[in-house]
Amino acid sequence: MQAEILRHALDRVPLSLIIDDSTVLVNLNYFFMRDRNPIDGERRRWEDVPVVHPESFTREFAEWCAAQGVKGKFSVVPCPAGLGRIDEPLPLFGSGQQESWLRMCRECIVPNFDITPEMLTHTFVLDLGTMRPVAPNLWEQWGWDQLPVDREELVTDYIALSCRILANAGLPPEGVTSPGGFGNPLDFYARCAAAAVRRVTGNPTPYFFKRVTQKGPIETPVWHADRQAGTAMGEIIAATGDRTGSWTGYGEADADYYITADLAGGRLPAVIDAGDPAVLISHWQGFYGLHNEDRRGFKVLQTVVGRLAARDPGGERTRWRRCGEITTYACAREMAELHAGDRTLTLDLPVRVPELTLRLTGVEPREVAVDGVPLRQVQTRAAFADGTYLHEGDATLVAFTPGRRETVLTV
């Protein structure tokens, strides 16, 4: 018998939506553009964009995503533009208004989206002692695009504080997001970020988001894997650029960039057909646009989600996933060891994930059991789910959630 762990859970290509630059009520990029224009001489339209994104819109957006099954990652910048910490009263809002947004986030966003910081401010690098900018021109994405590798403790503490603020606000993070170019070299960044998240949440397999690949294959890298400890740092890579209004809120909005009306063109069909994770990057500002009647990015997303559903109406080929589901599965797959006999497969699984999916060949199973518990046979891809197996040609697909590190599968 030969056995392999398939690249994706249930052998379905994951779809996922990354939402960047979001935070509690504040339009972070109003302040970003206002404060950055004098430094670099750009003429970004900061006076045209809203200062606040209302809770009502955020709730509507989250409820629509839940109804459509859309999942992904939602940034919450912990100290947006250095205005104040979200686990303390922000100067622009009353405590009731702020707590209402946080409660809405916990109830409506968290069930379907991982929460991550997008580092501390998404603008100035702050002095951790004073919580004031270190220097006017030292920004997280310019200056700390190359992290000070000789100050690993400082970088780890900086990221850990970002995570701690979210946890204090009732939003424990699953990983971290880079603001702009923040976070080189990657191996150093991955090590610091992993230590920071684990310090706050204890998560053995967090992840980071930094890179975007708009052409070619999409990987799901695993950093600093330790089989003995069962720890690793995952990385999610976006497969698209942003055509949902971008970070300004007044950028391009184009559904056809993602998937055309005939369901054949655009970036996403190519990614899906290649079997790669179809991860869309977006920015919260673009979904809302310049005002409540704009919603340019939200309209694009609604069109794209509808087209993706029409392309796979039975859900046999794709499945919406949170980013952390994708990266943790990649960690589990990379760190697993399989030892196959004639009718017995022994798995050593330092990281255990739901819906672990195997392909078996060279054997005709009479039945399939995991640790003595029989799995249910199904006849179609649409019915293939956790706790089942499916004969397909000369192979058998098996999906189950392992309960322990040493797991035995018999056929």
Residue ranges of predicted features:
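Active-site-adjacent pocket scaffolds in enzyme catalytic domains
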Residues: M1-A9, S16, S22, L28, ...
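A solvent-exposed, charged loop/short amphipathic helix patch at secondary-structure junctions
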Residues: V26-P50, R132-V149, F298-Q302
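C-terminal beta-sandwich/jelly-roll accessory domains of carbohydrate-active enzymes
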Residues: C323, A332-V411
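Aromatic- and glycine-enriched glycan-recognition loops and surfaces
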Residues: E42-G69, L90-I109, L154-L161
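C-terminal domain-boundary segment and adjacent tail
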Residues: M1, R7, V197-W223, A261-R352, ...
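Acidic-and-aromatic substrate-binding clefts and catalytic sites of carbohydrate-active enzymes
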Residues: V49-S56, C79-S100, T123, D127, ...
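A cross-domain feature marking catalytic cores of carbohydrate-active enzymes
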Residues: I19-D21, F74-P78, P117-T121, T177-G180, ...
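N-terminal regions that are enriched for targeting/export leaders
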Residues: M1-G72
